[in-house]
Amino acid sequence: MSVTYGFYNSKNKDRRYDAIQMSSIFDGIIRDGILQHVGTAMMVKESTGMMVNVGIGRAWFNHTWTLNDALLPLTVPQSEVILNRIDAVILEVDSRESVRANTIKIVKGTPATNPVKPSMIKTNDRWQYPLAYIRVNSGVTSI
């Protein structure tokens, strides 16, 4: 398995701890962010074609941890015909009861003559943290 995560509250007794209780033991010791001395700190690098690889690393956000223990290949969505855009490789922490997971994925930007970085979701139960931004020029077939 490449991406693992924790701590989340129990649902139907599938966990025996309260997530906030478990995670709070790290308050004052670990600050939110990517741990810079683990692997390549989730560094994003171009691969072949429209692929990028997210490097090995560990993160701590919103009382949850994420471990990426192998290169994680992601496919950048196909470029636009006329307009450019900026995509974001993000780590998403989703504590909604129906989800309870951390994921690494690409958020597609809005095509424009002068593109801007996509906005990150920051709500009470869902947060997105950018790992890298990728400029996708019109008509390209590789990053």
Where are these regions (language model features)?
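N-terminal "first-domain core" detector
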Residues: 1-60
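Beta-strand-rich solenoidal segments
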Residues: 5-13, 50-143
